[in-house]
Amino acid sequence: MALLLSVTNYMKALLYIFILSSSLPLMAQTPLLPFASSREVSKKVSTPDSQDVRYIPLFGSKKMVEEQLLNATEFLTQCDKSFKDRSDASNFFADRGWEYLNDGLLDTATYRFNLCYLLNHENVEAFWGLGSISYQKGNYEESTKLLRQGLILSPENTTLMIDVATVQLACYKEKRNCDDIDDALRLLEKSLQIDPSNANGWLKFSIAEFQLEHYDRAWDYLHKCRQIDVSFIDTTYLQELISKKEDPLGLFK
């Protein structure tokens, strides 16, 4: 058994070398609304866009995916030897993608999520990860599209619903061409109907109502967040809300 594990780890190490790619120079990242995902998206750095198809979400097009499959015979063979099946291999590369994303290596993370997708077109993590990267890069329209593709695969995923709504709120704030903010409200409402104990969901619901200048509702939802987990309250947002209307309960000054 120990020998089998050793061989498996060795094969995975070889696989790592096979798909290893160099990192590009780093640049500063603008602070964003945090996602609901338990995986922390990096606030440190990001990498510039690359024209290499490996660093374009889903390799850029269906045609490019088909070309990648034709050219990836050795990679797929190594995966078949190293993992119990391709779904397992896909999950492996998804995990690596989240690790690189947390380290701020966005292009490297993109390639890992692309490999995740190449191995399993129905792995929600591929769309979730690539959508998170697009959000980090400020490509909100692309992020919304990718996250929604993930939501099609996992329609009752409340955390993913909140992440889609988070992108839409950021998009709405910058007056970009995204889905209507009413859709963000609908997603938040649905997620909280399924899981009313989600403090981050109530926080995002509060922010949505704040952007619509519904300050009473914003306070109501913020206090629901506070009652569940006060640590989720964003102090910057709290001060913005106070500047528009004082706390009706008098708890925050």
Short names for language-model regions:
Residues 104, 138-139, 165, 170-176, ...:
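Short coil/turn linking the two alpha-helices of tandem helical-hairpin repeats
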Residues 32-35, 75, 88, 199-253:
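Terminal, low-structured helical/coil segments at or just beyond the last alpha-helical repeat
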Residues 29-102:
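N-terminal leader/linker segments that initiate helical-solenoid repeat arrays
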Residues 1-33:
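Bacterial Sec-dependent N-terminal signal peptides
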Residues 119, 153, 194, 227-228:
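Structural marker of alpha-solenoid helical repeat scaffolds
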Residues 99, 124-200:
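Alpha-helical adaptor scaffolds
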